[in-house]
Amino acid sequence: MSNIIYQSKISQIGEFAQDALTDGMLILFKTGAPADLADYCFVHNHDDLKQDLQVGQTIYLGKQSYKITAVGDVASVNFRELGHITLKFDGNSQAELPGTIHIKGETLSQLFVGDEIRIVND
């Protein structure tokens, strides 16, 4: 049985957020992000992260699902405190940057306001 450790919804899409997605990255930040950062982010209504992010968990973005393949050293802390992480759709087994989560699967083409973000332990 899957155990949901995080659940939220996209509330706003920054002007340049789609550009990052085209480059294989999705940047999340909670509501209230500084304006200069929010322009590049998919802003979400932040929830409590019930457990640290780990390799093997599944993240759902809208209707798509992805396996987490690497977790940066500060990704869980940043996500818990700031609602901020960068997701890279490259399936790397080593995190490039401390705040990055790498996921396996086809790069998401679009995410909409109201789409759900969910992270589960399988």
Predicted regions located by residue number:
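N-terminal, charge-rich interaction modules
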Residues: 1-24
